[in-house]
Amino acid sequence: MLDKIEKQNMDIERQIKEIKEAENMRKEFSANVSHELKTPLTTISGYAELMKDGLVKPEDMPRFSATIYDEARRLISMIEGIIKLSRLDENRVQLDWENVDLYELAFTIKNDLTRRSQEEEVAVHIRGVHTKIRGVQQILYEMFFNICENAIKYNHKGGEVVFTISKMNDYPIVIVEDTGIGIPKEDLDRIFERFYRVDKSHSNQKKGSGLGLSIVKHGAKFHNAEMEVDSELGKGTKITIIFPKQKSDL
């Protein structure tokens, strides 16, 4: 009887701790959202005001317009990321579990990123075999799209991104490896935090929403998958995702 009560007390304490941690994360997230949304809005507002008041030379108009466009796109990307993370946090994603072929999904993502990879002059290759898992296609797509997009964005001209899909003892494995700029060791433990960005000196001043890899982390957790990251500065990054053992008849 005492053991049962003690166990119940421990469960209650654990739940209280989880609630407090979740509340602290929400507060931190809200503060970060306010700051991160304000930054591109300030740039857009400032540049637009200068253009409205006729203080921009005609030859500078394309540069100002491009900056406004880029910041607006970043703002849209950030808002979309916030919505996706909120849905994952609150389990409000429509749970259409189905058999998903990760090999075919990789080709879909490659096609969707064709324009981006051509602009960055980065080749995307897909290797491996057809491998199916039970999962939510929408979330799996977001996971691997964000990984691949980052691998293209933070790469070199003439670089490569390689998707490898395999299965070992009925454990589906997806590896995304790039020849990009790499991640400093001191940043590896934090890259999946919301709004965390690697030092600009290492990322060629490229801007992102800071939410892509956080979506990856949440998506992996949603599917009970394990994730490993290996990276070497100046040589590239390798992200490995290992899904739970699947039924052999998938």
Regions found by a protein language model. Give the residues of each.
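Short conserved segment of the HATPase_c
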Residues: 183-197, 217
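Short alpha-helical segment of the dimerization/phosphotransfer core of two-component systems
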Residues: 70-76
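Short acidic helix/loop segment immediately C-terminal to the autophosphorylated histidine
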Residues: 52-59
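Conserved glycine-rich
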Residues: 224-225
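Acidic ATP/Mg2+-coordinating residue in the GHKL
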Residues: 178
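Conserved micro-motifs of the catalytic ATP-binding
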Residues: 90-95, 128, 132-138
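Primarily the dimerization/phosphotransfer
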Residues: 17-51
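Short conserved segments within the C-terminal catalytic ATPase subdomain
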Residues: 116-125
